[in-house]
From Swiss-Prot:
Active site (record annotation): 181 (for protease activity), 216 (for protease activity), 284 (for protease activity)
One GO cellular component term noted in the UniProt record for this chain: host cell membrane
Source organism per UniProt: Southern cowpea mosaic virus (SCPMV)
Modifications the protein undergoes after translation, according to the UniProt entry: The polyprotein is proteolytically cleaved into several chains by the viral protease.
Basic residues bias (residue ranges): 544-555
Name under which the protein is recorded: Polyprotein P2A
Region named Disordered: 498-572
GO MF assignments: serine-type endopeptidase activity; transferase activity
Disulfide bonds: none
Keywords: Covalent protein-RNA linkage, Host membrane, Hydrolase, Membrane, Protease, Serine protease, Transferase, Transmembrane, Transmembrane helix
Amino acid sequence: MYRPSCLSYVLLVANMWSFAVCANAFIYGSYDPSHNIPIVALMTLCATGLWLSTSVVSFGIRYVRVRVSPEKTQNRTIYVSSGLPHFDPVYGVVKKCEPMGGGPAIELQVNPSWIHLLPTSPAINKVEVGQESAILGSTYSVVETGGEPKSLVAVKSGDSTLGFGARVYHEGMDVLMVPHHVWYNDKPHTALAKNGRSVDTEDWEVEAACADPRIDFVLVKVPTAVWAKLAVRSTKVLAPVHGTAVQTFGGQDSKQLFSGLGKAKALDNAWEFTHTAPTAKGWSGTPLYTRDGIVGMHTGYVDIGTSNRAINMHFIMSCLVSKMETLPPELGYREISLEDVGLRSFEFLEVEIENRGKVKLGKREFAWVPKGKAWADMLDDDDLPLPPKMVNGNLVWADAQESFDGALPLNCLRAAGRNVLPPKLNLVTINSPVDPPTKQVACPSEIVDHRLASLEKCLENLLQTLSQPQQKFSQNSLSSGGLKGDQELKLAPCYSKQESLFPPKPRATSSKPITTSSPGTPGRSPLPVSGKELGPSTQSSSKLSRKQRRRRSTKRPVQGSPSPASPPPTRT
């Protein structure tokens, strides 16, 4: 409530007296110009009005100049933990938190004195931050700029790092080795980075790939110009050995990297192994380096805080990706047939390799699944073409799924190229006399004698050839039982061979009779050839008889064309 001051009361009394004087002087006509009181009263009233006007104006000015602003209050933001703690190689144990009222999430560094209050192990990385895991008891080391391996490269998606890969040598070309879940991520890859420099990625050709999480790899054909711009060199892939020391590399970018050390542990399956090297967020796909090269590629964790998992790229590139038909035996890997898979007591893992096909993996063996179906399996299919139908005794090909020419009737066009009526079904029986069987005419004795003489001449040449290396031995050795049996075995096939190679043919007629030998020529008998023993006395008598027959045959030459059944003597 407004309370006037004493000055206000004095002004009020003075203005009331001045108003009364002015009213008496000017209104009621009692004004005397010689008196000054009315003038003073009038001046008092004017000064009071002027003062009031000035006060109102000054109040208005002050009112306008006053600025009204909202009241300032203290805002309080509450953040809620939205993930399990994970270990960061730079900041230690970190938790992801989000504001209660909405907004961007932050990462909270946990005080080491509060680690024991966390519900789970602080040395883990769960699905929220990747498939990597730090190993309890292991440490991280800071890598100097340019001190990382020359083949290491980072895969970027904008300003975030999806993972790491390496340039490796494979069958005359350099390819980028990277996990499948990194290259085909929900966030598309945009660049390859190395030591603070990056090159945009394109739709490059893929040499081979596998989307199975247990065989998680991609081999990308990156142009040589990209490698040259990033100064990335290639390295070789080696087979892992149990207990080998391995080293991993990673970080939030390609310029500030960290590394971890561990050991490789072999498993029963040749395509995978475990290691104790620590990893962190964004390290997926980091190669496992040794002193001589790369022995594997990190793909995830097996036991949180204890071991990580890696794939054996040497087995994959040598057996599943390589185009070599044979494998070196020193590798210890064996390819088997698909039928042998069912004979094994252990299970096989079936995966599909892009640009290669399906393959079954079991321990240190693998078998390729053939493409398509076997011929025997195709016979059991129900999608075979429909056969023609029988309608009124005729085959109808209209509904059959086979190609045919409907304009040409079947079995009506002959080789002569003219239309011929089909044969009638009702044929007239015709009786005809049956010809008597023809009698076989025996071979003349002259032909038999001629063939026998030719055969004996061939056998004589053969015996002379066989007897030449035996002249150095005595008569006792010639008459031994072993030599007799040997000669019989050697002579018997020659006789059968001559008869089988030169079958008898009809002989042309001649104007003169053929006289080949004297009437004393013995008949055809296989006994001198294979059935009769050839002792020393028998050989001498047979040689004399053959010489006499040869002389007689030379004195009486055979006239006419020679018989094709008597071949020239064969040298053996």
